[in-house]
């Protein structure tokens, strides 16, 4: 909105030319989302308390019982701040911006239904796994189809550290892109079990993929760094900036001890958006590295369930996802969170190194 109001005036006021730059508008979106989060956060938390939208806690983790009743569905605050910031600072004529918002809000709507069902039923169960998966398939399928049907969008796959290895998946790219989005969404959802555990790495991941998206959308940079170019995708950097800002603002209240939880409306939407960002900048496989924390949490659940079924009741971990295993080992929650954040930053640096190590 601001973009369209001020850019036409550049001919009269040259200083306004700064609003043409994606980098400036991305920083502006970050600051806008951050301020909105911090300003509206307390009022939003009070509103959730009045509605009695409290979190129902996993009974198997005794230390979590004190968190019962903490306001949930904080993802609505994140969504509000991101959408407002993108609408203010983004180029709304860019199709990739709208596609990203569609995925973000689509997965968020699914999470909202799930959260609302939990609140109404007064238990820690919402949608069934099949219902949730069906919704994810629909949202990711529409987004992936729009990309595959775009003649200017490549269905080639970039392999980290190998600049000349770019296999073309053709129509198989559609289910692959869907898998990336659904997998990322569920992975973030599984990770969201401790105060600030999911949002911290999300901020790091959003910043990292914001950089890759900016490079992919800049023809000269993409050529120099040998990254697959995607014309027009650079504008989505504004969304990434807004996500980082909203994430920082939410962390202000979600840090241990949390005053609010993001709920499924937050974890599913952020995870789905993260997967789509990786797809947009042609760095789908890099998400496994940069989002390694989310991958580890998901793999721990898969291994636990599989081993439990194969052995008739035996377990690899004391509890899955992985963060609960460390909790039951006696590691303080705050220490688990900080250590996982550190690992996330290190993994992001490994991902960043792929820009030159090819």
Swiss-Prot record:
Parts of the chain that traverse the membrane: 27-47, 73-93, 97-117, 133-153, 165-185, 196-216, 233-253, 260-280, 285-305, 335-355
Main localization of the protein described in the UniProt heading: membrane
Gene Ontology molecular function terms on file: metal ion binding; phospho-N-acetylmuramoyl-pentapeptide-transferase activity; UDP-N-acetylmuramoyl-L-alanyl-D-glutamyl-meso-2,6-diaminopimelyl-D-alanyl-D-alanine:undecaprenyl-phosphate transferase activity
Cofactors: Mg(2+)
Annotated GO CC locations: plasma membrane
Catalyzed chemical reaction(s): UDP-N-acetyl-alpha-D-muramoyl-L-alanyl-gamma-D-glutamyl-meso-2,6-diaminopimeloyl-D-alanyl-D-alanine + di-trans,octa-cis-undecaprenyl phosphate = di-trans,octa-cis-undecaprenyl diphospho-N-acetyl-alpha-D-muramoyl-L-alanyl-D-glutamyl-meso-2,6-diaminopimeloyl-D-alanyl-D-alanine + UMP
Domain of life: Bacteria
Bilayer topology annotation: Multi-pass membrane protein
Coiled coil: none
Gene Ontology biological process terms in this record: cell division; cell wall organization; peptidoglycan biosynthetic process; regulation of cell shape
Biochemical pathway: Cell wall biogenesis; peptidoglycan biosynthesis
Pfam families: Glycos_transf_4 (PF00953), MraY_sig1 (PF10555)
Keyword annotations of the record: Cell cycle, Cell division, Cell inner membrane, Cell membrane, Cell shape, Cell wall biogenesis/degradation, Magnesium, Membrane, Metal-binding, Peptidoglycan synthesis, Transferase, Transmembrane, Transmembrane helix
Keyword Magnesium: yes
Subcellular location(s) per record: Cell inner membrane
EC annotation from Swiss-Prot or TrEMBL: 2.7.8.13
Alphabetized CDD domains for the sequence: GT_MraY (cd06852)
Known role: Catalyzes the initial step of the lipid cycle reactions in the biosynthesis of the cell wall peptidoglycan: transfers peptidoglycan precursor phospho-MurNAc-pentapeptide from UDP-MurNAc-pentapeptide onto the lipid carrier undecaprenyl phosphate, yielding undecaprenyl-pyrophosphoryl-MurNAc-pentapeptide, known as lipid I.
Family note: Belongs to the glycosyltransferase 4 family. MraY subfamily.
Name this protein carries in UniProt: Phospho-N-acetylmuramoyl-pentapeptide-transferase
Source organism per UniProt: Solidesulfovibrio magneticus (strain ATCC 700980 / DSM 13731 / RS-1)
């Amino acid at each position: 909105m601001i973009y369209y109001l001020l850019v036409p005036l550049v001919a009269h006021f040259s200083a306004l030319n700064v609003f043409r730059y994606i980098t400036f508008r991305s920083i502006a979106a970050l600051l806008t989302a951050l301020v909105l989060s911090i300003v509206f956060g307390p009022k939003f938390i009070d509103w959730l308390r009045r509605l009695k939208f409290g979190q129902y806690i996993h009974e198997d983790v005794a230390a979590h019982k004190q968190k019962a009743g903490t306001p949930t569905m904080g993802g609505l605050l994140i969504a509000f701040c991101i959408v407002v910031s993108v609408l203010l600072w983004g180029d709304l004529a860019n199709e990739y911006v709208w596609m990203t918002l569609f995925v973000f809000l689509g997965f968020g709507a699914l999470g909202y239904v799930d959260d609302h069902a939990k609140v109404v039923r007064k238990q820690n169960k919402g949608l069934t796994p099949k219902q949730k998966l069906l919704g994810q398939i629909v949202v990711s399928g529409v987004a992936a189809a729009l990309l595959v049907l775009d003649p200017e969008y490549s269905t080639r796959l970039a392999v980290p550290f190998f600049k000349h290895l770019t296999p073309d998946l053709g129509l198989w790219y559609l289910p692959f892109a869907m898998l990336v989005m659904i997998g990322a969404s569920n992975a973030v959802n599984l990770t969201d079990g401790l105060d600030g555990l999911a949002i911290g790495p999300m901020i790091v991941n959003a910043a990292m993929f914001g950089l890759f998206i900016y490079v992919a959308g800049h023809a000269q940079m993409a050529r120099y760094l040998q990254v697959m170019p995607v014309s027009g995708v650079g504008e989505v950097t504004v969304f990434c900036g807004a996500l980082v800002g909203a994430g920082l603002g939410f962390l202000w209240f979600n840090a241990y001890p949390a005053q609010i939880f993001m709920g499924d409306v937050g974890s599913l939407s952020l995870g789905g958006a993260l997967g789509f960002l990786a797809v947009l900048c042609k760095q789908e496989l890099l998400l496994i590295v940069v989002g390694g924390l989310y991958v580890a949490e998901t793999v721990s659940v898969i291994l636990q369930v599989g081993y439990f079924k194969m052995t008739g009741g035996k377990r690899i971990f004391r509890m899955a996802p992985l963060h609960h295993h460390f909790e039951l080992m006696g590691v303080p929650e705050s220490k688990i969170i900080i250590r996982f954040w550190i690992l996330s930053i290190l993994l992001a640096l490994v991902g960043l190194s792929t820009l030159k190590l090819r």
